[in-house]
């Protein structure tokens, strides 16, 4: 079960073509947009040494009007995906909201190294480092962390750490309350099995092999320590990361400004695709509100 959940295949560079196709299915023309900016030298690649000394990769692109950039967004992908998949968010931030954007590959995904999918728990350390890198590249004092699915769990988990003062906001879209809660749902949906003994054993293997347990990887526990303003998004038709995770996450954050928006009729990671104008409007209004706090 541990290998099944955390060491899936194909992954990494072997999975690039599928994710490029997925990016275009979510917003047509996304890979052509990406390839065009890259050919012009506007969109660039970079690598750093991430957590546990694995080399990790990201792309970055300046705002459409760099001289008047409104800030910098760190866009974080989900489980089994990579930096290509959520190009719709990169395009939203860069082209429509005039933000600089850095969008990484988490460990074991895309062009990044890694020995397993970390479910956000260790990924948060790399995202925090990427925020520092983006701040160095663009010089902004307003950075927003925006994640979807496992990426949303990653940014929620990061929000409970001590973040630099330029990280001003977090947007989480359909993140799970903990790795344990998520795998429990998956185990029931896919195999009609209870968490004991399989999930319990897999969590113990993860702790022994990688240093973290499924219950330890908790968005909820990190949110209890979070003070950074946060927008919570979830589709009410989501049964992959069940909709009730939204309220559980939202209620866990008791300090700092927060908002909630529900994507009506949206399945998992589909709120933007179903309501693109409304999604963008809520993100824009939230970020503008944060700037007044």
Predicted regions and their residues:
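Short beta-strand/loop motif that positions the catalytic acidic residue
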Residues: 225-227, 232-234, 238
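Alpha/beta-hydrolase active-site loop
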Residues: 117-138
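The serine-hydrolase catalytic nucleophile loop
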Residues: 79-93
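Short alpha-helix in the alpha/beta-hydrolase fold that links the catalytic acid
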Residues: 89, 219, 228, 242-251
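Catalytic histidine-centered segment of alpha/beta-hydrolase-like enzymes
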Residues: 266-276
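Conserved alpha/beta-hydrolase
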Residues: 90-113
């Amino acid at each position: 079960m541990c290998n099944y959940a955390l060491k899936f295949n194909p992954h990494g560079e072997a999975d690039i073509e599928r994710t490029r196709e997925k990016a275009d299915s979510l917003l047509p023309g996304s890979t052509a947009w990406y390839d065009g900016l890259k050919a012009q030298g506007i969109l660039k690649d970079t690598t750093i040494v991430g957590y546990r000394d694995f080399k990790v990769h990201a792309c970055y692109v300046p705002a459409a009007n760099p001289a008047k950039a409104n800030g910098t967004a760190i866009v974080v992908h989900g489980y089994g995906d990579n930096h290509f998949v959520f190009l719709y968010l990169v395009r939203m931030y860069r082209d429509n909201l005039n933000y600089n954007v850095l969008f990484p590959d988490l460990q074991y995904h895309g062009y990044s190294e890694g020995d397993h999918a970390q479910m956000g728990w260790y990924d948060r350390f790399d995202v925090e480092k990427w925020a520092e890198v983006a701040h160095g590249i663009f010089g902004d004092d307003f950075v927003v962390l925006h994640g979807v699915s496992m990426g949303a769990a990653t940014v929620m988990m990061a929000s409970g750490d001590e973040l630099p003062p330029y990280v001003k906001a977090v947007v989480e879209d359909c993140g799970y309350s903990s790795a344990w809660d998520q795998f429990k749902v998956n185990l029931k949906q896919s195999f009609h099995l209870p968490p004991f003994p399989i999930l319990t054993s897999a969590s113990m293997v993860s702790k022994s092999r990688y240093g973290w347990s499924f219950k330890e990887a908790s968005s909820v526990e990190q949110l209890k320590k979070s003070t950074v303003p946060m927008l919570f998004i979830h589709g009410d038709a989501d049964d992959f990361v069940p909709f009730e995770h939204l309220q559980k996450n939202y209620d866990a954050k008791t300090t700092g400004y927060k908002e909630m928006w529900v994507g009506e009729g949206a399945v998992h990671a589909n709120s933007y695709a179903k309501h693109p104008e409304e999604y963008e409007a809520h993100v824009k209004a939230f970020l503008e509100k944060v700037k007044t706090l």
